[in-house]
Amino acid sequence: MQLNSNSIIKSGHNDNGYYRKYADGTLEMWGSKRFDNVDIQTPDNWNYYTGSRANVPLPMESKTWVSVTATAAGSCAPWISIPSNGLGTELFQAWIYSSNKSASETITIFWRCFGTWK
């Protein structure tokens, strides 16, 4: 009896992160991306955000838009928002928010996503 026929076919990594290809066509990717000198000064109600989206490149192109789970870390207690039009096949985009206004922050986005490779 075979318990799981959805075996890992290939796995690897590059500068953009790690990936696994599964037999059923699922593509799993994960990693982190550091952003230096992030300007978080655009007001949004009682918070602040970056004036442009942060681009997070994926380690491998997906055949479909990816589904992303991500979080942010930094001294300004940041969080992120990934808009639906920020999802792609080669990267995803995120707005970085904070309750603290800052002209120069170092933020790391930790992420995991799923797409397809076939």
Predicted regions and their residues:
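Glycine-rich, low-complexity segments
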Residues: 1-30, 34-37
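Extracellular attachment/recognition segments
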Residues: 26-118
